[in-house]
């Protein structure tokens, strides 16, 4: 979350016309419910036309914001987020959904890449101290244009490069794979 917040602060510097009215978000036993309550209180303070968008650094926050927007009839406010889940995809596809875009990395790819890094580390190969995954924008318009159900596993059919990277695949992985068959 800290890196996401730092990136947001940099974005604010690049686009000073973006004005932050409020900042909320805390991890709790009911993140979605707590966020919905906090966003609901904020919506009561600002009449229509005063808030253009809500940005969530985590989809659990965004799910709560979505709930508040729907419950308060404030779907004119667009919702932008980081991370994706099957629930998020369903909410984005609902008629009249304010959830405009989510930016995410395939969670399965994160796991696979981490396993590759661990394998390389155990084998004594050089590994980086940090790694930045290439995130993909998942626009609502693309999701609603799909004729059938959409889930995280099927995003690779509509998002180019989703779930794909050859980073940290060592040549000796093929030998290990052949032995396991």
What positions do the PLM features span?
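A residue-level marker of the well-folded mature domains of exported/periplasmic proteins
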Residues: 1-181
């Amino acid at each position: 979350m800290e890196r996401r917040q730092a990136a947001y602060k940099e974005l604010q510097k690049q686009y000073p016309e973006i004005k932050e009215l409020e900042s909320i978000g805390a991890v709790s036993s009911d993140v979605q419910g707590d966020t919905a309550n906090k966003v609901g209180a904020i919506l009561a303070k600002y009449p229509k036309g005063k808030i253009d968008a809500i940005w969530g650094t985590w989809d659990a926050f965004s799910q709560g914001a979505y709930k508040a927007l729907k419950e308060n009839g404030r779907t004119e406010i667009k919702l932008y987020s980081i991370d994706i889940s099957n629930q998020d995809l369903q909410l984005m596809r609902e008629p009249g959904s304010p959830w405009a875009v989510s930016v995410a990395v395939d969670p399965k790819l994160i796991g696979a890449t981490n396993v590759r890094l661990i394998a390389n580390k155990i084998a004594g190969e050089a590994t980086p101290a940090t790694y930045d995954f290439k995130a993909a924008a998942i626009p609502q318009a693309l999701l609603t244009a799909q004729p059938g159900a959409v889930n995280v596993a099927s995003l690779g059919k509509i998002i180019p490069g989703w779930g794909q990277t050859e980073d940290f695949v060592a040549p000796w992985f093929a030998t290990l794979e052949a032995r396991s068959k």
